[in-house]
Curated annotation (Swiss-Prot):
Protein name per its UniProtKB record: Putative glutamate--cysteine ligase 2
GO molecular function: ATP binding; glutamate-cysteine ligase activity
The species this protein was found in: Mycobacterium avium (strain 104)
Keywords attached to this entry: ATP-binding, Ligase, Nucleotide-binding
Catalytic activity, reaction form: L-cysteine + L-glutamate + ATP = gamma-L-glutamyl-L-cysteine + ADP + phosphate + H(+)
Keyword Nucleotide-binding: yes
Protein task: ATP-dependent carboxylate-amine ligase which exhibits weak glutamate--cysteine ligase activity.
Amino acid sequence: MSSVPARRGDAHIDFARSPRPTIGVEWEFALVDAQTRDLSNEATAVIAEIGENPRVHKELLRNTVEVVSGICRTVPEAMEDLRQTLGPARRIVRDRGMELFCAGAHPFAQWTTQKLTDAPRYAELIKRTQWWGRQMLIWGVHVHVGISSPNKVMPIMTSLLNYYPHLLALSASSPWWTGVDTGYASNRAMMFQQLPTAGLPFQFQTWAEFEGFVYDQKKTGIIDHVDEVRWDIRPSPHLGTLEMRICDGVSNLHELAALVALTHCLVVDLDRRLEADESLPTMPPWHHQENKWRAARYGLDAVIILDADSNERLVTEDLDDVLNRLEPVARKLQCADELAAVADIPRHGASYQRQRRVAEEHDGDLRAVVDALVAELEI
């Protein structure tokens, strides 16, 4: 049971409520120099040339451009939305001698040469987090799914943790760190959790518990705004969504569509089961903590914990059953083809596996890894 008080007088957080399970996607890209393949701190100039565009955002570091979709009903609609923004953006980037690059981390870039975006909230973050904050050379994909009631948010979020290792293993794309093979499939997952309020969410049962938590965080000066809760899965109250932030950066639209479809189907499936008064599956937090580590370390070779009884199974074997169970949901959500494409990732190799193959084929030259990832982005 949570020890967070159920309610405080001024702790209320409005949740916007989404009448439909709409989706929105945030896709973070790094800028790399076309000649050196190293990171380029030119995002401010790129965004200025793109002009006022609600689909293109700046981020913490000046090597990063975030492309976002609008509010979409289906995965194909979201992918087309992103494609429409990416095409012109990439032309501008290429005209400036750079390429768009996406993975959980850059294979060899050094944090000491990266410049911060000029914004008070970023300056405050670095002032507080210091060395760890400056180390955040990481990129990810965030998927928002609309939820109709705040009363559903915590039960769905807690149950979604059971699928954390599946999503991380499939998307893992950060085996390298400053030129070194870390031995991990996703070093990004290990890095990001070093920031305050980041990492696995607390397993609250009610919205009131979450409100109490945020109240305490604000009162003690840990955060100023609810958006500073940086959990791997978190509510976005002003949007009326659950935001899945598990996935490493994804290099291509085919895999992105597959992972977004899997996320959409998982959330909607749990939502419908909750409406049918089913009890949603949960596990103790120590199992989720171990599953996160196993998926980050071993990727698709991870043996994960399945339930509160501590049963285990290879993540790819369990994934097959998950995909079969979600197939009817995907048909109703008009993303059956995209969900089926999830199986292509283990079949062809996840990004971390492909990156290591490229490095081996090029005698360890990590510039070739950057080239391979850049080439995967077909718009």
